[in-house]
């Protein structure tokens, strides 16, 4: 079976340009024991993607040239040799910019079915972005009704959710963003 994959060929200098990422078609490897094959159906394209292409270690290990471009995905398990995961289950993981990924199950999260939430919510409000906003605001600051909450990067993914949670909690919310256009 063939797998289309975006490969980091060189570290971009400034803006990403042709040739930094290349679309390749490779064979999907056979599974070993305790592995799963996931067919990706959603890919989260995030500002962090550009930072990961720097070759520098940050909160995650640095990418190397030749790596599949890193990215969060939602997918369906197509094949399983892992006792925890069953064929047909929907999961969230760092599956990368590719049609299929093979995983040993580490970092793979099963998405509950029958919740009524669209799947893409598990990559935003019910995923890392939403959890960062929720716990970062409510566990760290404990905002109270009537308080003023100042949010930097308020136009960003996490910041915009922090603003909404602040409003729900009864705060006066002041958002800061990097440009006039982002403030509109």
Feature roles, as predicted:
Residues 1-4:
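Extreme N-terminal starter segment of soluble prokaryotic enzymes
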Residues 12-18, 47-48:
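Short N-terminal binding/cap micro-motifs at the start of the first secondary-structure element
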Residues 15-27:
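Short glycine/threonine/proline-enriched tight-turn/helix- or strand-capping micro-motif at secondary-structure
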Residues 28-45, 53-97:
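Glycine-rich beta-strand-centered segment in the early N-terminal region that forms part
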Residues 39-42, 106-145:
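Extended, non-globular alpha-helical segments
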Residues 95-108:
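A structural motif shared across PLP-dependent enzymes of the aminotransferase-like
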Residues 127-184:
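Mid-domain Rossmann-like dinucleotide-binding core that forms the NAD(H)/NADP(H) cofactor-binding site
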